[in-house]
Amino acid sequence: MRMFETRAREWILLVKLVLFTSIWQLASALGSMSSIAISYGEGGSVFCGLKSDGSHLVVCYGSNSAILYGTPGHLQFIGLTGGDGFMCGLLMLSHQPYCWGNSAFIQMGVPQPMTKGAEYLEVSAGDYHLCGLRKPIVGRRKNSNIISSSLVDCWGYNMTRNFVFDKQLHSLSAGSEFNCALSSKDKSVFCWGDENSSQVISLIPKEKKFQKIAAGGYHVCGILDGLESRVLCWGKSLEFEEEVTGTSTEEKILDLPPKEPLLAVVGGKFYACGIKRYDHSAVCWGFFVNRSTPAPTGIGFYDLAAGNYFTCGVLTGTSMSPVCWGLGFPASIPLAVSPGLCIDTPCPPGTHELSNQENSPCKFTGSHICLPCSTSCPPGMYQKSVCTERSDQVCVYNCSSCSSHDCSSNCSSSATSGGKEKGKFWSLQLPIATAEIGFALFLVAVVSITAALYIRYRLRNCRCSENDTRSSKDSAFTKDNGKIRPDLDELQKRRRARVFTYEELEKAADGFKEESIVGKGSFSCVYKGVLRDGTTVAVKRAIMSSDKQKNSNEFRTELDLLSRLNHAHLLSLLGYCEECGERLLVYEFMAHGSLHNHLHGKNKALKEQLDWVKRVTIAVQAARGIEYLHGYACPPVIHRDIKSSNILIDEEHNARVADFGLSLLGPVDSGSPLAELPAGTLGYLDPEYYRLHYLTTKSDVYSFGVLLLEILSGRKAIDMHYEEGNIVEWAVPLIKAGDINALLDPVLKHPSEIEALKRIVSVACKCVRMRGKDRPSMDKVTTALERALAQLMGNPSSEQPILPTEVVLGSSRMHKKSWRIGSKRSGSENTEFRGGSWITFPSVTSSQRRKSSASEGDVAEEEDEGRKQQEALRSLEEEIGPASPGQSLFLHHNF
């Protein structure tokens, strides 16, 4: 009986140890597992992390396209680790590693060979290898003493084998060519692998005990066990200065390890960083070059992750956004990531729950993130409350003996008991309170006067009779010195959007039932509805979300743009509704849905309906709509989300460009870039815009080029069922090799006029060039597509630059539906006049202007027609993949 009790106690201790080690990994070294990780190398650097919404899904940011496009957005991970050109994570369901990116030594996906049924506690990645710690194995010796051993599986360069160690290990951390871990029994360090370049194994301080360790490129740093929590480092990269820091002393920066106690530590290539225990700020030491940015001061971090030459950390607070420092990576990353791993077990001693009620990263009931407790206070402060399971310790200033400005200002702003202290407090605060009251009264007066003037203005406008509106001139244009100019006041009155009531639209859409849904987006649903007059419409309803500001901005953007723009191939806005917290937009109904449904839907017959003539016609019509936005709206409009699901098809198979929620007004000079954070859809997103945050009309040209490849091939922009998941990376090599037949959609027979499709392929390849300035403008793209369509339709005059309007625009497309609705409105219905329209041209004007003048695109087309196909394709030679940030040059020059 006692034997069974002894075994039960040992099993309970073992389970507790496993749970503790699974949540204690608070920082990601060069190859440790955490909720955030960094991949590096010549292909570009990438930061990845688990989303802050508690979904355990991965989000990435950086310049390595293989990792960005290969990110498995549908898989849930326990933790992440990164190496040279690849990223790996531990799957939540199978507890097996899964990798993506590009590595010559590790198989992407689940690494092979993989033992059937094997489950892992944690994984760690080095430069070219990956190791995983299996769940503990418990055995029995002959003398009946229970022993624990560890089984570690490794894959990659000189590491593909199974290791069995006669001790229980945890906290795996990988260097460039080696791996280390902590012994659960005596807290000593154990390492294995190649130590020729690092000497890490021979230099292990065997008599020392550690709380945690982190391996760098060629060194290891660990936090010593005990109250002091000092850091100790060993290895070759922190001893031989000449081999690391360059030849000139002016290029060297050597920082010694800190003396303060640390909470966490991470290792880079030739340096290390840690989180200070008393204020959670970051500190770094080791070898740097003078171009490296230092660690930020005055801010705290939940977690750190190190790459080769830079470090990123998750800020404390509610934003959970990462910031980076060092060399070769942006300082700010537009993501929100989890500062740790969500667990549903109580926090172990020495840790506390992350308190963030406003935006909790853990969505499951009873789950939380555990963080280490702070054990000391900064100088001049004392501990007011100790660390508990629910919150960290609280430190306050000792106001009786202030020796710093921060202490004085903090103490002066808080009221204390006693008459003397109160008098001192009011003597400091009375001038501030007086100024605040005076400013508040001034602000109230300004707001009151402004409100009174606004109400007076609206009342005066309401008194204007309807006869005054009817007495305006019939023409929206007047002559000025022989030049035609638009009358903006008249255009403002004619460009109007009908105001619907919510009750009216709810009845039209049959109560917004799920059966009425005809489309869904990230922030809205589209319902089919029938108005009282029998008109079929599409009602776009914003989804209730916590991010109300973003939904409101997209609603306002689309309403303002579509109420001002008018073109045959832009989706027409009929009206809107904004009441009771609901935001709805009413459009004309597109009977045939989106181009995406035709090309990629499950119904094969629907795909076959779009023969080559219809596909190219849709491409021409979409191009004319985008050309109108770029060249005939003033200021230009940049759509930012051109894709097949935003190209809608009406009952006559005419195309309309839709969804202007992400659109922006561009500069009058279309060549000038806008500094904007990337927004759009992966696969269609301009790489130059994604990396440099420079937005121009050429970003829409890139997206349209991807759309052309999608129309020609029938493949999705990103389809991970293929080895080359990105359509651009797949199609461009085929075009360069002249293998056009392999590019075309196999569902359709090749047309007799194959030269027309070769023209379109050439246009698409030019549109997806890496640099925006090398791409053609939309007017040149439209001209080339119109000629290709004329040739495809068997037009005997292949030199005709412009197709007849009825071919391109559609025979019955005259904007009658929207005006018919306006004419049936009663006097009691609300109509809001939108702001002044931009100066624009009728849609047919673009064709006439391009026909009347020989543009650069026309001259280029005429010259290309006399060349052979192989010469034309050879001229398209250029790299499509993202540019390397220059790590190889940095290594060669500095190390």
Curated annotation (Swiss-Prot):
Q: Where are the sequence repeats?
A: 38-73, 77-112, 130-167, 169-202, 210-245, 262-296, 301-339
Query: What does the record list as coiled-coil region(s)?
Result: none
Tell me the GO molecular function terms: ATP binding; protein homodimerization activity; protein serine kinase activity; protein serine/threonine kinase activity; transmembrane receptor protein kinase activity
Query: What kind of membrane protein is this, topologically?
Result: Single-pass type I membrane protein
Membrane-side (Cytoplasmic) residue stretches: 456-895
Residues that hold ATP according to the record:
518-526, 540
Residues in TNFR-Cys repeats? 346-395
Tissue specificity note:
Expressed in seedlings, floral buds, siliques, leaves, shoot apical meristems (SAM), and, to a lower extent, in roots.
Description of post-translational modifications: Autophosphorylated and phosphorylated by ALE2.
Q: Which Pfam families has this protein been placed in?
A: Pkinase, RCC1_2
* Signal peptide (from-to): 1-29
Q: Where's it mainly located?
A: membrane
Which cysteine residues pair off into disulfide bonds? 347-370, 373-387, 377-395
Q: Which Gene3D superfamilies match?
A: Phosphorylase Kinase, domain 1, Regulator of chromosome condensation 1/beta-lactamase-inhibitor protein II, Transferase(Phosphotransferase) domain 1
* The family this protein is said to belong to: Belongs to the protein kinase superfamily. Ser/Thr protein kinase family.
Name of this protein: Serine/threonine-protein kinase-like protein ACR4
Native organism? Arabidopsis thaliana
